Amino acid sequence: MALRGVRPSAISAAMRTDEQPIRISLFAPNGRMGRAISAAVVEDPGFAIDEDHGDVMIDFSSPTGLQASLDRAVSGGIPILIGTTGLDDFAGRRIAAASKDIAVLQAANTSLGVALLSDLVERAAKVLGPEWDIEVLEMHHRLKADAPSGTALALGDAAARGRETKIKAERGRDGTGLKRGEGAVGFASLRGGTVAGDHDVIFAGPEERLILSHRAESRMIFARGALAAARFLVGKPAGVYSMRDVVEAL
């Protein structure tokens, strides 16, 4: 018997029992993160890849593929995790529009460690006074196309939240007359080798420094974090979610 007004995929997701694996529909499954997530699914019997009848869609593609993945998730009535970085304000508006119909989790980094780092950065920025300058240093592999990394920018946003202000970003300083702006958050990017992702948030105060760091040794940490986010999204009402919500639900 068909249920009027409910998409078939939404019905199947609602009927899934706790004993059945969560079905992952991968957008761009042949990308680096797509392959890593497929490998993580093989490790975890609680998940399965099902491109046609997914309970959750995961998109780690590119900004140009965002609209197609959102359309596919909305038409299927399933939640979506967006791990794509380098998105602009227009992409943000498209995500907000989709979140009226489905649950959307956007994360520049799906590592659970980075989610905790973000909380620590916000806390440190709140506790330490304005005399502590904040710098974000990140390094990634030679093939990464965007800079600063989405994670670095998200950590800068966390610092701004702690200071209860809007971020004043200073990126890639080069030249002369570049005295640090009051209340600025500086960003520096390094590229080389096969580095999966290094991030340091430096709080430089009077005669002391606090450095909060995270080192990603493999893309598998992002893949496992993406599966944790997918598990969180199953059954969630329409709206926008974050990795902080995932960590708080653990």
Where are the language model's segments positioned?
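N-terminal amphipathic/basic-hydrophobic helices that include classical n-h-c signal peptides
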Residues: 1-14
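Extreme N-terminus of proteins, especially the signal/transit-peptide cleavage junction
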Residues: 13-22
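C-terminal substrate-binding/catalytic lobe of Rossmann-fold NAD(P)-dependent oxidoreductases
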Residues: 23-54, 64-67, 130-250
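Short, structured coil segments at secondary-structure junctions
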Residues: 45, 76, 98-100, 183
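Beta-loop-alpha module in the N-terminal Rossmann-like domain of NAD(P)-dependent dehydrogenases
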Residues: 57, 61-71, 75, 86-91
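Rossmann-fold NAD(P)-binding glycine/threonine-rich loop
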Residues: 70-71, 84-105, 115-124
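Rossmann-fold dehydrogenase core element
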Residues: 79, 94-111, 129-134
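Short, ordered loop/turn segments at secondary-structure junctions
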Residues: 85-87, 109-110, 139-142
